[in-house]
């Protein structure tokens, strides 16, 4: 009977470890086979930048430089995951700015990079530069307008 308890205890540990691993795998999202990209604004030679991994810091544009702060994995489940801050994804945020938050596969983290240049969320909002192409300008989301230059982006390797 002592052996049976040991086996049962080991089995329970394996089940718990397996369940935790499954949850972690589900939340992580799979990176696209194409590798990381930069999201370059059509306003100029400026790219989407995550200068801080803080949830309270806005995403901004800065001159494109190819650093990990400006590189993004477009995951198979349509999340835009930071290379500099793995496990942190672009979130629609609030009315003030877009920001990074833990990748949890919420609808507010589902994005499509469209051929017309829009980076559109499943909530029908698009990434928008809030002003001109000056370094440090905040990026937010607004109603999508395919004619708005501040909503035009290119996905570049």
Swiss-Prot record:
It is a single-pass membrane protein. Residues 33-157 form the Ricin B-type lectin domain. This is Uncharacterized protein Rv1419. GO terms for cellular component: extracellular region; membrane. CDD domains: beta-trefoil_Ricin-like. Keywords: Lectin, Membrane, Transmembrane, Transmembrane helix. One of its GO terms (molecular function) is carbohydrate binding. The lineage of its organism: Bacteria, Bacillati, Actinomycetota, Actinomycetes, Mycobacteriales. The chain crosses the membrane at residues 6-26. It is found in: Membrane. It comes from the Bacteria. It comes from Mycobacterium tuberculosis (strain ATCC 25618 / H37Rv). Its main location: membrane. InterPro entries: Ricin_B-like_lectins, Ricin_B_lectin. Pfam families: Ricin_B_lectin.
